[in-house]
A protein has these predicted regions:
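One-carbon transfer enzymes
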Residues: 1-173
Length: 173
């Protein structure tokens, strides 16, 4: 199966390179689209993975095999999950793998992976951990596809209002 990685990372980024390596295990072509979709549009025969990307997929391009690695827990949709984890004095953070739908972090949740946060954690350290966990989610997803396993929602639900990028940047000031 071919894989298209939708991302905001730059070519040469070690995380993007690792993500590409994982996707190559499916045996098809792997390509990267930075902050957008392929010029040819989308198709039902390709696996699309939004890996640390900021792009919102338009409704007319949504496909069955389209997933997002959200670097935050289901309660912190959109931007700034790591900042909200610190503001709310949480003891753990998470990354969430979900199917992409027309909302911002609203698609069926496939898997959530939690990790501890302590008093020494910063937004940068939490994000660095989240990036690694997002890569683990890609590895898991590729393994499921490679082994022919059905991808099913976990039953976990999204909550909270999404934070916009503009709001996140304002709160960092």
């Amino acid at each position: 199966m071919d894989v298209c990685i939708l991302t905001s990372l730059e070519y040469g980024d070690h995380l993007l390179n690792s993500c590409m390596d994982e996707c190559e295990r499916l045996g098809g072509d792997v390509w990267v689209e930075i902050d957008g979709l392929p010029d040819a549009g989308t198709n039902d025969d390709t696996l699309y993975i939004s890996f640390l990307g900021d792009y919102i997929v338009p409704k007319n391009h949504l496909k069955k095999h389209m997933y997002n690695t959200h670097p935050g827990p289901p309660g912190y949709r959109g931007w700034g999950a790591r900042l909200r984890t610190l503001q709310d004095n949480k003891k753990q953070h998470a990354v969430t793998l979900h199917q992409i739908d027309e909302g911002v972090d609203t698609g069926p949740i496939i898997k959530t992976e939690y990790f501890p946060v302590d008093e020494l954690s910063t937004t940068d350290s939490i994000h660095a951990q989240a990036e690694v966990h997002c890569l683990r989610m890609v590895r898991w997803l590729i393994t499921q596809y490679k082994e022919g396993k059905k991808i099913v929602p976990s039953g976990e639900q999204w909550s909270g209002r999404p934070m916009l990028k503009k709001t996140y940047i304002e709160q960092l000031k």
